[in-house]
Structure formats: structure tokens, C-alpha cells
A protein has these predicted regions:
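A common structural junction motif
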Residues: 26-27, 66-73
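Short, exposed beta-strand-loop hairpins at the edges of beta-sheets
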Residues: 62-64
Length: 78
């Protein structure tokens, strides 16, 4: 499977709401998108997630579910 680094830039004032949703609904990944690890910097409102998938189009589906709270950047890892 191909690995990807996802950079989540939390929208201003949304940190608490993001984690409230996460605690209720989980990460809301589509089937086929796999979480490996994550690192959060609360002071900078940013999260880095190491992920893998055989279908990069699944990221768009996942991003759509969080777009009201998070802006995403996606980087394939070679």
C-alpha cells in the first residue's frame, strides 16, 4: 500500500469541536483508508497523520466529511 502524510490545518476556533466530533464519530475514514499514526501540535492548530491506501481518491471522500472544521494537505510518500 502507498503511504501518505496528511496535514490537517484546524480552522480558527475549531479545536474543541474537532475532538468532540472525533469522540462521538471517530475519524470517519472510508473503507480502504488506513490510519498508521498521528501527531498534534495544539499551539499551532495542526495535526500530521501518516496514512496508507491503494486508492488515493478515498482521501477526497474523507476530507469532505471534515471540511467544515479542517483544511487538508495531502503528500504522497515515496
Amino acid at each position: 500500500m502507498k503511504k501518505y502524510m496528511v496535514v490537517e490545518n484546524y480552522k480558527e476556533g475549531c479545536f474543541e469541536e474537532i475532538y468532540e466530533r472525533y469522540n462521538v464519530k471517530g475519524r470517519m475514514f472510508p473503507i480502504g483508508l488506513h490510519f498508521l499514526n498521528s501527531w498534534v501540535n495544539k499551539d499551532k492548530n495542526i495535526c500530521f497523520q501518516l496514512m496508507e491506501s491503494n486508492d488515493p481518491d478515498l482521501f477526497s471522500e474523507w476530507f469532505e466529511r471534515w471540511k467544515d472544521l479542517v483544511d487538508f494537505e495531502l503528500y504522497p510518500i515515496d
